[in-house]
Amino acid sequence: MFIFIKHGDNQQFLANINCSVLLLLHYARRKVGLPKTETIDLCDETGTMKLFFLMKTPGDYANKFLTARNTYYVCKVERGAPGTRVESAYKAFVPLLKNPEPELIDALRTQCDLLERSRVKMLRIQEAKKVVPIESSVNLTSKSSGRSDEEGTTRRAPVLKTRADFVSRKDKHR
């Protein structure tokens, strides 16, 4: 099973999708002449990103995510400048085409904005979890009685009998 990958000035090449996503992206990166350090992804003709660069398991086969005989575009994932506060921010998804369609650029921009908003939202949630003070369970109100633990609700532990307890009782009765 093969797909068409377009790039540059209306150039294209075939790629076999009976391989891992990682291998497919390495192949595409080499074919378009990008260094290994560049983050790339594929998008379909409508501009829908496949988000392979976010995959937890890049060893999964590409044929699970791509349709044979379809055309895909190579897109470069631009992130924030290294060493800055916005280092992991998503700046843009840039199609590696000489004259991309305006609809394609709009679709990629929209997806990039959504992904960035989602990333920022997750960061805020993580920061909020770190800031929330944890109350001691001693001061919490008991659900069954409505009284706090400090007001003297004492619970008796169940009496556990061991084998030694039974043996000593038998000895007492003899």
Swiss-Prot record:
GO BP annotation list: transcription by RNA polymerase II
Superkingdom to which the source organism belongs: Eukaryota
Pfam family, one: Il2rg
Disordered, as annotated region: 138-174
InterPro entries in alphabetical order: CXorf65-like
UniProt biased composition (Basic and acidic residues): 162-174
Any one Gene Ontology molecular-function term assigned to this protein's record: RNA polymerase II cis-regulatory region sequence-specific DNA binding
Database matches in PANTHER family: AB2-183 (PTHR33887:SF4), PB1 DOMAIN-CONTAINING PROTEIN (PTHR33887)
Annotated protein name in UniProt: Uncharacterized protein CXorf65 homolog
Biological source species: Bos taurus (Bovine)
